């Protein structure tokens, strides 16, 4: 996702090497790469930020990520790419504290809001107070063919979301805490990294009501999921 405000620009969750070239070609239709202020990462997954070294080499952008990942992100950089980066990595990194913070963006801000354990232990979402869009990362993600259009039939959309959230999200408690936070925000659109967006207060509230009551992650685990004896008994040695 690309946010542009006056002469400022930020890209959110730009992905890995597979997406770097096509993404930069699209970005150059709207901005000069050298004018990019930020490369923002919701969490540490390869499909989120593995292309970081290339952004550091080819732009002057600052990387924004959770403080938990500050010591891990340099491991994405090969020795070859490290030699090409023009400055020390720590000088081009904003480490977000757990409670989040405002990221300066011209005469406004991008708000980093906490979304920890949804699914990463150091996870953030990003809110644009001008457009009132919440870029929600993996929260609200869906497995659909047509991701360009927003959700219009929420009940029909549930099957494309349920399995992903039950596997990747930590617990119903965390999702409910997150939903309560979003209800206190002035959000007109929730845009996940994958799948359809939720547009308008009514559709957003439908999603928040559903996600805040969905058992997932550790809620679904039993002792059968940690059955060492069953594993041993199932192993056959010829």
Outline where the language-model segments fall.
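Short Gly/Pro-enriched turn/cap motifs at secondary-structure boundaries
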Residues: 93-94, 114-117
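Short acidic-hydrophobic surface loop/beta-edge motif
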Residues: 3, 100-105
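Active-site HxH/HxHxD metal-binding segment of metal-dependent hydrolases
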Residues: 19, 27-99, 210-216
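Short catalytic-loop micro-motif centered on adjacent basic/acidic residues
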Residues: 10-13, 37-41, 112
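Metallo-beta-lactamase
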Residues: 109, 116-192, 196-201, 214
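Active-site environment of divalent metal-dependent phosphoester hydrolases
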Residues: 19, 44-49, 70-73, 99-101, ...
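C-terminal regulatory/interaction regions
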Residues: 200-238
